[in-house]
Amino acid sequence: MIFSTLEHILTHISFSIVSIVITIHLITFLVDEIVKLYDSSEKGIIVTFFCITGLLVTRWVSSGHFPLSDLYESLIFLSWSFSLIHIIPYFKKNVLILSKITGPSAILTQGFATSGILTEIHQSGILVPALQSEWLIMHVSMMILGYAALLCGSLLSVALLVITFRKNRKLFSKSNVFLNESFFLGENVVENTSFFCTKNYYRSQLIQQLDYWSYRVISLGFTFLTIGILSGAVWANEAWGSYWNWDPKETWAFITWIVFAIYLHTRTNRNLRGPNSAIVASIGFLIIWICYFGVNLLGIGLHSYGSFPSTFN
């Protein structure tokens, strides 16, 4: 009873903080960025991280098993993973690009998990026999950490593509205007050229930063995903007598692994870095959501215990 009440309190606190942080983000987005407000939102995410940590520990103690047995618990852990990735650049103060992705990801995931949509599966139940194994922590935690890192890295690649597309589009339109004006304003040609060069330099620097951090975060996520798949195969052999059963979840996890293996391969080729490898990562972003969330909507296969309740099928 005590643990249930504590869990209920932590859930409401985290949801309230998330709501406040979302409001702050909207204000700083619509109005010129206010440093104090932005810093408050960053601290709010850190407080949310500790609330989620307390929620996971409380649920673990009350249920007697690590809280990764259903969709609700995995969403909470996914939000915790986003928050963990977010905290590292926050304290380093020099990786603001990454925090721009991890912050909103943690907020939205936690907001969805603690909203009323998944009320029916908030209560922790008894583990099905297949999940009563020490491999639960190793396999599922590695998979969720992998999803979190890969999603963050993929979003950085999406941002890279958007900026590159806008850059090419604006350069084409502005070059025409610049050439036309040059005939009438010959004395301003040098000043205009200097302005465009400076602007393009900073944009190129941003694209390089996005590409660099996308590669690093995806490499980390790929490592987690690989460990998760291998540990899952060992667990499957112990539980079902086979390392691989081509279950829908297993199949899509394998597809996810292949897509990001292709990304890492293209990223090592200098001619394919930047937009080309970012396209592969962007495709991977969609594949991850199909693997993690889409398969759960079907509620079929050996991993159906993690699906939505019957009212959503």
Swiss-Prot record:
Keywords: Chloroplast, Cytochrome c-type biogenesis, Membrane, Plastid, Thylakoid, Transmembrane, Transmembrane helix. The chain crosses the membrane at residues 9-29, 44-64, 71-91, 111-131, 143-163, 217-237, 244-264, 278-298. GO terms for biological process: cytochrome complex assembly. It is a multi-pass membrane protein. InterPro entries: Cyt_c_assembly, Cyt_c_biogenesis_CcsA, Cyt_c_biogenesis_CcsA/CcmC. GO terms for cellular component: chloroplast thylakoid membrane. The keyword Amino-acid biosynthesis does not apply. It comes from the Eukaryota. It is found in: Plastid, Chloroplast thylakoid membrane. GO terms for molecular function: heme binding. Its main location: plastid. It holds the Pfam family Cytochrom_C_asm. Required during biogenesis of c-type cytochromes (cytochrome c6 and cytochrome f) at the step of heme attachment. May interact with Ccs1. PANTHER family: CYTOCHROME B_B6 PROTEIN-RELATED, HEME EXPORTER PROTEIN C. Belongs to the CcmF/CycK/Ccl1/NrfE/CcsA family. This is Cytochrome c biogenesis protein CcsA.
